[in-house]
């Protein structure tokens, strides 16, 4: 059972009168961000993957766990970064290793966005990338920084196919001193993880940490969505019966915390560590008896206890104070009628169970207060990364970060030995503080804050043996954005390179640290729901899963692809040095076979001359090389490589350019599970009824229930989808193909 330290403990790291440490929930700076979008804490952005065969397989940290396949283990992905955060850069020593540097987020107004690649065709079509990755797709929901984005479900699944991202060596080392602001719109639906803090006493909900840099007047539009709209959207996804019963419940019935359920305070001698320091697990961890080290000194939990009345109170205050912020965009949940958005400003905290079961090594209550792990800080480095790389790329980046830090450590050790006869100490003992709000790195001896990251800024954490890699997103000021974003003119938003801060730690509890952070996302999301009068149990997907299991997969795609008459092997003749003369686009994540689609052919080119190809055909392989699951850029490179050949062998599946979608929705309470922006499908929830029906990311909706929506306003498309029940018939095609066919884009033949 979890134990928390008494608030009166003098040695608590949260007692700021004694020493710096994590800020208690009720003592957070007044200017902290107070906005809490619904998507803020959806833990579905986390993926689990293992590097050790003996790693346990925790369930996915999701509120809506639709996916039958749980990722196996303990590296966590938060592919939810759309907006950006200001973070203090770490000044680098000559050898490139950083120690004892304060590192704090300067702007807690971080908000993830969901765009459609800035315009209409999102790089999320990339999801078809790695074949394995398609099944491990990241599921997130966020607000968009683009035009109007409307969510059709509580989560979506996306993985980005540009999985050939090289780890740039030209920017190899530690963090630069200046902060720089990421500045791009990106589409794939993701969710942002927002810290929730008490609002400012003056009612200002601008949302910035004490380290926030001065903003210009032009940044007003970056303020986040008002929370009442978000709460309204959540409630629309619930049945009216459950909402009524929830709202009638009284706060007096909230589960009481046992006052005796706290541990003895750790004395200062317990927290100080000498050269023979042993690392101890928090008492809150649910470890099997054989795993616990009874002889280890328990640094235990250094937390602040809140009463049951206080806990729901501070997030609830934000509901009242968050209304003044302008909405960056309009967003509707297509789970129910879109006109039911009038939710009272004040909400009663219903008597819901404290927590729905959240798999993980910690007690949920302890994660709210914060737990501490002992670790050694090895160093930090910086990598360039795409906005949302695949899980494989994330792991490659983590390994690259470890390699860099170890090289820097080795160089520093050699240099120190050369300058002095003394022993070169390159390890820094730290306390790794994890809570549902933030992750802090504290000097184990002085308890000084070395690094401070809001939980929502953590994009990935992996354990590699006894090494923990923590990746956090950086936000860059617009004036320096060009120095930090590597891109080429005309490049897609998803192809831009963004700076990622990587901290490397060593701990015997590496796997538990990774799992605890993943669990923290889930607990934070449930806290947000409870604070706004929504019973987390109402979001149970059992009934929804029963509906899904009765539906056929991919509409009629299986029949079409299994029909041998549609599968053809073609031989094309061409002149040496002549291009094939085609334009290909991605089939879109969600298609049964993620590959490229023939979108256009050059008049008089080899492809058009043959008369064997048609627009809409899916190319399975070229000269024996399979294109299934490969990123678009890789497929284009293979086609370009045919220039000096005189014969080309193609395996294709003949398909019409328009895809037929059939979604079976028995009732409005069942979420559709995809989001739309300006007629483009931006995100898709893995395992949802939309995926079953053939919805594909990156496709433009052409027709809904027999009515053309090509020239229909975005709001009307959303309304039509929101109110549709029964069988929903749609016709879609890749957005890039639509733009080519309508003359909105000039084809670039290859």
UniProtKB/Swiss-Prot annotation:
Which spans does this entry mark as compositional bias, Acidic residues?
A: 81-94
Question: What GO CC annotations are associated with the protein?
Answer: cytoplasm; cytosol; dendritic spine; plasma membrane; presynapse; Schaffer collateral - CA1 synapse
Task: Report the InterPro entries cross-referenced here.
Answer: APP-Binding, PDZ, PDZ_sf, PH-like_dom_sf, PTB/PI_dom
Q: Name one GO biological process term.
A: presynaptic modulation of chemical synaptic transmission
Q: Where is this region: STXBP1-binding?
A: 185-271
Which stretches does UniProt call biased (Polar residues)? Answer: 70-80, 332-344
**What sequence ranges are listed for the domain PDZ?**
569-655, 660-735
Q: Which GO terms describe its molecular function?
A: amyloid-beta binding; identical protein binding; phosphatidylinositol-4,5-bisphosphate binding
Description of its domains: Composed of an N-terminal domain that binds STXBP1, a middle phosphotyrosine-binding domain (PID/PTB) that mediates binding with the cytoplasmic domain of the amyloid-beta precursor protein, and two C-terminal PDZ domains thought to attach proteins to the plasma membrane.
Q: What is this protein called?
A: Amyloid-beta A4 precursor protein-binding family A member 2
- Species this chain originates from: Rattus norvegicus (Rat)
């Amino acid at each position: 059972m979890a134990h928390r330290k008494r608030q009166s403990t003098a040695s608590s790291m949260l007692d700021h009168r004694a020493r710096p440490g994590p800020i208690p929930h009720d003592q957070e700076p007044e200017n902290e961000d107070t906005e809490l979008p619904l998507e803020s804490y959806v833990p579905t952005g986390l993926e689990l993957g293992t590097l050790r065969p003996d790693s346990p397989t925790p369930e996915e940290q999701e509120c809506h766990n639709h996916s039958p396949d749980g990722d196996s283990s303990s590296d966590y992905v938060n592919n939810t970064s759309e907006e950006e955060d200001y973070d203090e850069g770490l000044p680098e020593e000559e050898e490139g290793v950083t120690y004892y540097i304060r590192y704090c987020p300067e702007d807690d107004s971080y908000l993830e966005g969901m765009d459609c690649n800035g315009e209409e065709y999102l790089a999320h079509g990339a999801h078809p990338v790695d074949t394995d990755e398609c099944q491990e797709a990241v599921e997130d929901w966020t607000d968009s920084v683009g035009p109007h984005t409307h969510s059709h479900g509580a989560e979506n699944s996306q993985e980005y196919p540009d999985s050939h991202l090289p780890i740039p060596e030209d920017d190899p080392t530690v963090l630069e001193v200046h902060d720089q602001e990421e500045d791009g719109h990106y589409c794939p639906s993701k969710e942002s993880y927002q810290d929730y803090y008490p609002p400012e006493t003056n009612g200002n909900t601008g949302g910035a940490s004490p380290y926030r840099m001065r903003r210009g007047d032009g940044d007003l539009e970056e303020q986040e969505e008002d929370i009442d709209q978000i709460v309204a959207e959540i409630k629309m996804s619930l049945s009216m019966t459950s909402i009524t019963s929830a709202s009638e419940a009284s706060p007096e019935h909230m589960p009481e915390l046992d006052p005796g359920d706290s541990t003895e305070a750790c004395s200062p001698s317990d927290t100080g560590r000498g050269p023979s320091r042993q690392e101890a697990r928090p008492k809150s961890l649910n470890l099997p008896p054989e795993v616990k080290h009874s002889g280890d000194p328990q640094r235990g939990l250094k937390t602040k206890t809140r009463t049951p009345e206080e806990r729901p109170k501070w997030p609830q205050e934000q509901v009242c104070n968050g209304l003044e912020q302008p909405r960056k965009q309009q967003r509707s949940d297509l789970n129910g009628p879109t006109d039911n958005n009038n939710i009272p400003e004040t909400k009663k905290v219903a008597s819901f169970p404290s927590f729905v079961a959240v798999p993980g090594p910690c007690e949920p209550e302890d994660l709210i207060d914060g737990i501490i792990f002992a670790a050694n800080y090895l160093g930090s480095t910086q990598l360039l990364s795409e906005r949302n790389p695949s899980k494989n790329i994330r792991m490659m980046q983590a390994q690259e970060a470890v390699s860099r830090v170890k090289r820097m450590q080795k160089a520093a050790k050699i240099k120190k030995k050369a300058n002095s006869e003394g022993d070169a100490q390159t390890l820094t003992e730290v306390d790794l503080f994890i809570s549902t709000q933030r992750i802090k790195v504290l000097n184990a001896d002085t308890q000084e804050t070395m690094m401070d990251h809001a939980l929502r800024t953590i994009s990935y954490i992996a354990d590699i043996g006894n090494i923990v890699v923590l990746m956090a997103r950086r936000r860059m000021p617009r004036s320096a954005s060009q120095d930090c974003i590597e891109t080429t003119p005309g490049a897609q938003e998803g192809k831009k390179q963004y700076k990622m801060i990587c901290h490397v730690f060593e701990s015997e509890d590496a796997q538990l640290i990774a799992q605890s952070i993943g669990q923290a996302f889930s607990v934070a999301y449930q806290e947000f729901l409870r604070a706004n009068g929504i019973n987390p149990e109402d979001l149970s997907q059992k009934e929804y899963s029963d509906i899904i299991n009765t539906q056929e997969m991919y509409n009629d795609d299986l029949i079409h692809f299994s029909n041998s008459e549609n599968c053809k092997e073609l031989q094309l003749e061409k002149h040496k040095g002549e291009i094939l003369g085609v334009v290909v686009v991605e089939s879109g994540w969600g298609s049964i076979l993620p590959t490229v689609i023939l979108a256009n052919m050059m008049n008089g080119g080899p492809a058009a001359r043959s008369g064997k190809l048609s627009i809409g055909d899916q190319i399975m392989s070229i000269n024996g090389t399979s294109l299934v699951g490969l990123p678009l850029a890789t497929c284009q490179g293979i086609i370009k490589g045919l220039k000096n050949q005189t014969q080309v062998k193609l395996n294709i599946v003949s398909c019409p350019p328009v895809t037929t979608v059939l979604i079976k929705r028995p009732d409005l309470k069942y979420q559709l599970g995809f989001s739309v922006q300006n007629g483009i499908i931006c995100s898709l929830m893995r395992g949802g009824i939309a995926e079953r029906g053939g919805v594909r990311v990156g496709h433009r909706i052409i027709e809904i229930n027999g009515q053309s929506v090509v020239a229909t306003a975005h709001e009307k498309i959303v309304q039509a989808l929101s109110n549709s029940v029964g069988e929903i018939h749609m016709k879609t095609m890749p957005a890039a193909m639509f733009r080519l066919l309508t003359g909105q884009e000039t084809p670039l033949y290859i």
